[in-house]
């Protein structure tokens, strides 16, 4: 005895036939009989995902509002920057528990000097750091100042400050 499916609306139910009759039954069996072409196409499209619900890629508005990877910082400050709380659940829980908001990253001495060299505060964004670097390099470049030694030293200090901030993950 061999199983043969009863039909589309009777899944899990089978007729029991001998081998010869199963072959004959299967030749004439059509799972999509009684369905229009558009219904068959819809079934085939849904079968790609196993008939599970799907959503269009990129429609989540919160996916666009977060900082880009290049704007995030490293360490615990980076983890805080990447965390999103669109409904305010975490901030409400912190307010109820009396715990303060997470602290900003404490600058090391060289990092603070680097920000000072670029003329920026510790809360400067990646874009601010890059803009200040670009302006100062143009201003103090030896070709722009006729080879002035004082300007050349400032030029080196600006480059070193930017490289330090870049290595520290600020830009």
From Swiss-Prot:
InterPro entries attached to this UniProt entry: DjlA_DnaK_co-chaperone (IPR050817), DnaJ_domain (IPR001623), J_dom_sf (IPR036869)
Region feature Disordered, mapped onto this chain: 56-83
Compositional bias annotation for Polar residues: 57-77
Entries under Gene3D superfamilies matching the protein: DnaJ domain
A Pfam short name: DnaJ
PROSITE patterns membership: DNAJ_2 (PS50076)
Paired cysteines (S-S): none
Domain J span(s) in chain numbering: 113-170
UniProt name for this protein: Uncharacterized 19.0 kDa protein in cobS 5'region
Source organism (scientific name): Sinorhizobium sp
